[in-house]
A protein has these predicted regions:
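Polytopic membrane enzymes that build or remodel cell-surface glycoconjugates and lipids
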Residues: 1-431, 452, 463
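Small-residue (primarily alanine) positions within well-ordered alpha-helices
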Residues: 116-119, 170, 177, 390, ...
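Small-residue hotspots
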Residues: 147-154, 163, 170, 295, ...
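Structural signature of tandem alpha-helical TPR/SEL1-like repeats
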Residues: 369-375, 400-414, 435-449, 471-483, ...
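Conserved alpha-helical positions within TPR/SEL1-like repeat arrays
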Residues: 389-396, 424-434, 459-466, 493-500, ...
Length: 633
């Protein structure tokens, strides 16, 4: 049975995608955004729950509102737990579905199989798209694209209700879809050639405006908008050109590109000239080759929300932002190449296949960098300069790897040197220094800097308290824990840590009192330590150890012929450990040789036997003393 050509193309798409991305089944989560969205998010880690669903619908954590994306992460946890490989594969499956849907959409709209397939394969396999697919935290990209393509497909079919539903779901996945109405207008121009149907799209523009307002409000409230350098028009214009260049030569890709201190004016001028020239040519040729204008303005329009005119975040640009915009450039190449090489179909096919194979090869290598945080950020440091985010995250990862603290400190020190105002990096450097012999005071200094830079966060106070406790400055540590709890009463584990510090204070006071010759007060302090923290075993252990010390001193005094001193030491030992049978027995022995102390000695022997009925020495000593007593007593 012969399969239809479209089905073969879909199957080849799926095979190519899984050939490139199947390796991610063995990958870990990374320490950049994955903790906020999945691994350290208590709501997501519970899986699907009623409370979690309500949180997903209302949460603006991490300066974003995308409830559908949050629910998808919860569903992953519900189905697969915290197995990172399955979380990766779910993103791959969504990417595969979006790629197939893109092909079917273009086929439906244009009827041109080969160019439609080329665009779909470029979308599926381009190295710039690896970040969106291989990064668990970028689930929002693949979900947004899937709903975007569904809305376009429904529009081509004339199913208006589905267009609205898909658009709303897309907005709830990632607000970048706000430009959907513009892409529908471009479809009207080409390939549908319907003329502009603006009126029917007014509800979609209203939804887009609402989504844009929500996004701006949430990101400003979450601190994602950089108020010190809010507008970045120069970098935005240059970035458009860089994105085009990276599409055709995807080398030196990294998870983070540092924002430049300044953008050279001549770079901006060249970018403006290039963008204007291409735009003018696209408009000029809109009659003969309308796909050029449709593709070019798709690229410009869909990239506009994230191009950085209003700065959101610290990055200059990001590979993931090209996930949907690249389709416009691919359309220009696919249909333009078809026209230019119409007389050479074999050459056209060979070039298309070669381009797709090259994309797949580079993408496969790029996917490999996402294996874990070390491979990801080490590669970023190789292909970028002054990358403080890569230094910071690599250092944080290495802090948790056995025997690699010196490397961690090196990377974290570079991070704070490159970006002195990065409070989290100072905090993480402090953690690494606290684990480095002889660097505890340096760690405390870093935590002080972090507290200054992050005055609204309880985390630096917790880290400071941990370091102060490690340094033995327990009263100061207790005060920092109290500050952290005032700022965040539900801060995980802080109450337990503060209890341990308070218990340690009583424990150390007890030890000091014991050494100072105040056993009763010492025992009371040790008991208080146990009352505060029942898991605080050291108090009991120390009490027994101190009892043993005084017991041995008593033995030494007895052997040296100093019974009074021996009795005092045995009595002190019993204050620390009242159930010390040997101390009762030996106290009885020294008391039995003291005039008028026979009854006290007998009481000590009897207590030793009560504690240890099989204690033969105590029994023999008791019998011997009772036989020596005068009759009638």
């Amino acid at each position: 049975m012969r399969l239809p050509a479209d089905l073969w193309i879909c199957l080849l798409l799926l095979a190519a995608i899984f050939g490139v991305y199947a390796q991610s089944r063995q990958f870990a989560f990374v320490n950049y955004d994955d903790p906020d969205y999945v691994t350290a998010n208590p709501h997501v880690r519970q899986g699907i729950t009623a409370d979690g669903a309500l949180w997903a619908l209302t949460s603006t954590e991490a300066a974003n509102w995308f409830p559908v994306t949050r629910l998808s992460h919860m569903l992953d946890v519900q189905l697969f737990g915290m197995d990172a490989g399955w979380h990766h594969l779910v993103s791959v499956l969504i990417h595969a579905a979006a790629s197939v849907l893109l092909f079917l959409l273009l086929m439906r709209a244009t009827g041109a199989r080969a160019p439609s397939a080329f665009v779909a394969f470029v979308f599926a396999l381009h190295p710039l798209h690896v970040e969106s697919v291989a990064w668990v935290a970028e689930r929002k990209d693949v979900l947004c694209a899937l709903f975007w393509f569904l809305a376009l497909w429904a529009y081509v079919r004339g199913w208006r209700a589905l267009v609205i539903v898909a658009f709303v779901l897309g907005l709830m996945s990632k607000p970048m879809i706000v430009t959907l109405p513009l892409t529908l207008l471009l479809l009207d121009m080409w390939p549908l050639k319907r003329g502009l149907r603006l009126r029917e799209k007014l509800p979609l523009f209203a939804l887009a405006a609402a989504g844009a307002v929500v996004t701006i409000v949430v990101q400003k409230a979450g601190g994602a908008v950089n108020p010190a350098a809010m507008f970045g028009l120069g970098n935005a214009l240059v970035s458009y050109v860089v994105y085009v260049a990276k599409t055709f030569w995807p080398a030196g890709l990294a998870v983070f590109y540092p924002y430049p201190e300044r953008v050279a004016l001549w770079h901006v001028a060249l970018a403006v000239a290039a963008l204007a020239a291409i735009s003018w040519q696209a408009i000029r040729l809109r009659g003969a080759r309308p796909y050029l204008a449709a593709g070019w303005f798709w690229f410009l329009a869909t990239l506009l929300p994230v191009i950085g005119i209003v700065r959101v975040g610290e990055q200059a640009r990001a590979d993931r932002y090209m996930y949907v915009p690249m389709i416009g450039l691919a359309v220009m190449v696919a249909w333009g190449g078809t026209d230019l090489l119409r007389k050479w179909p074999r050459l056209r096919g060979a070039l298309a296949i070669g381009a797709c194979v090259a994309c797949a090869g580079v993408a496969w290598a790029q996917v490999g960098y996402w294996r874990n945080s070390e491979t990801l950020f080490a590669h970023a440091l190789e292909v970028t300069t002054d990358n403080y985010i890569a230094e910071h995250n690599l250092g944080t990862y290495l802090t948790d790897q056995p025997g690699r603290l010196p490397e961690a400190v090196t990377h974290l020190e570079r991070a704070v040197r490159l970006q002195p105002e990065l409070g989290q990096a100072h905090s993480d450097l402090g953690i690494a220094l606290a684990g480095t012999p002889g660097r505890l005071e340096d760690a405390i200094a870093e935590f002080r800097t972090a507290m200054r830079l992050r005055p609204d966060s309880e985390v630096p106070h917790i880290n400071m308290a941990n370091a102060l406790a490690q340094a033995g400055r327990l009263k100061e540590a207790e005060a920092e824990y109290e500050t952290a709890l005032r700022m965040q009463p539900d801060a995980p584990g802080v109450k337990d840590r503060m209890a341990r510090v308070t218990a340690e204070m009583h424990f150390q006071t007890g030890v000091a009192l014991a050494k100072g010759g105040h056993p009763s007060e010492a025992a009371a302090e040790l008991d208080t330590a146990v009352e505060i923290d029942p898991a605080y075993k050291d108090a009991h252990k120390t009490s027994v150890a101190l009892a043993q010390t005084h017991y041995q001193a008593g033995i030494a005094f007895a052997q040296a012929g100093h019974p009074s001193d021996a009795a005092a030491e045995f009595q002190t030992a019993l204050r620390f450990d009242p159930d010390f049978a040997e101390a009762h027995n030996n106290l009885g022995v020294v008391l039995s040789d003291m005039p008028g102390k026979e009854e006290e000695a007998i009481a000590q022997f009897r207590e030793a036997l009560r504690l240890r009925p099989e204690y033969d020495d105590a029994r023999n000593n008791l019998q011997s003393l009772e036989e020596r007593r005068p009759p009638g007593r």
